[in-house]
Amino acid sequence: MAKVNMVNLTRRDKERNTIQTEAEASYTVFEMNGERYFQIDTYGTRGRKEQGKVSQVLQFDEESVKLLIKLLTTEFRF
C-alpha cells in the first residue's frame, strides 16, 4: 500500500518493458483530515489464491492528482 509521492516521481526509460497481466481494480474517493484522496485498489490476477482480496493500493492526494494529470497529458499528448 502506498500514498504516491508525485513530487519525487521521475521518468526511467528501461531497455526492457513487459505488459502485465490484467487484474480487477476499483477506485474510491474519500476525505480525511480535510484532505480529499483518490485511491485505486487492485485485486490480483484471476489465478490468485485469495480471490477478491486487495492486492495493492495506490493513494493520491489532490496535489498528486494534479501532477499526475499534467504528466499523463504530456506523455500521451492530449
Model-found features: residue ranges?
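Positively charged, low-complexity terminal tracts
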Residues: M1-F78
